[in-house]
């Protein structure tokens, strides 16, 4: 006999009610404990869930750690690329962690957040690696349901997508546009689940976009999510190859192009 009760994750949700626990208060207490001054982050920030970008940049002696980033869980790495200063946070893997950091970044002065996550190929558009600008993401995780009522997908802001349309045509690695599957459980990507997601036309599987877009819509914050399609879920030999410098060169080109176009449309 099946229960008719509402699943716990959907119960007693008031989406219009403010949170009693805020990122501003948390960061304020962290600064007090750590003896840090209140200082803003760059207006364009980046989530680098794999951490390869930050590791490569550190190895090359580029950029600096922000000594006043008060987050308890991460470092923020400042890098200037093509005249734009970025704040990059590495290894915030998965929907809850990504959204926690997004909340803290926007509370600290971020104006645009770009997520560059590695992803597994579902639809065989071409051989990896390549990029997808995620237009919508299937909500197969949990964090998005704390920000928006139940729905199948979270969507990128159409105005933000329009602002960067056509910006990537000159890059050496293609940037496709389409939908992805956001999961909380990569090691539960069963053959049946993969087939179902492919039948929906989803191009890749990743772990953050649905939650970040739900956060963006609920909080009215500009967020762009890219999937760096690097693998076929370890089902072929020689998988997980990102390209030059662990994909850093091409990923930075995509990020910088998006940021430059966003800034030009803002002015």
Regions found by a protein language model. Name each.
Residues 1-114, 120-267:
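Accessory terminal and edge-of-domain segments that mediate assembly/interaction
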């Amino acid at each position: 006999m099946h229960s008719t009760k509402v699943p716990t994750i959907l119960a007693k949700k008031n989406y219009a009610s403010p949170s009693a626990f805020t990122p501003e208060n948390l960061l304020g207490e962290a600064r007090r404990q750590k003896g840090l001054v209140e200082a803003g982050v760059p207006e364009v920030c980046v989530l680098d869930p794999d951490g390869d970008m930050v590791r490569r940049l550190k190895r090359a002696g580029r950029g600096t750690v922000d000594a006043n980033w008060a987050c308890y869980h991460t470092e923020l790495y400042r890098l200037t690329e093509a005249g734009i200063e970025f704040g990059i946070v590495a290894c915030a893997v998965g929907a809850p962690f990504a959204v926690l950091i997004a909340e803290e970044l926007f509370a600290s002065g971020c104006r645009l957040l770009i997520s560059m996550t590695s992803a597994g190929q579902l639809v065989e558009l071409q051989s990896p690696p390549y990029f997808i600008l995620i237009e919508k993401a299937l909500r197969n995780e949990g964090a998005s349901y704390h920000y928006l009522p139940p729905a199948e997908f979270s969507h990128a802001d159409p105005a933000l997508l329009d602002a960067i349309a056509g910006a990537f045509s000159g890059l050496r690695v293609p940037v496709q546009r389409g939908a992805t599957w956001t999961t909380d459980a990569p090691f539960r990507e069963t053959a049946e689940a993969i087939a179902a997601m492919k039948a929906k036309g989803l191009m890749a599987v990743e772990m953050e976009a649905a939650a970040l877009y739900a956060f963006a819509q609920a909080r009215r914050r500009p967020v762009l999510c890219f999937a760096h399609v690097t693998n076929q879920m370890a089902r072929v030999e020689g998988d997980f190859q990102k390209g030059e410098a662990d994909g850093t060169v091409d990923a930075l080109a995509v990020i910088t192009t998006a940021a430059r176009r966003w800034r030009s449309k803002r002015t």
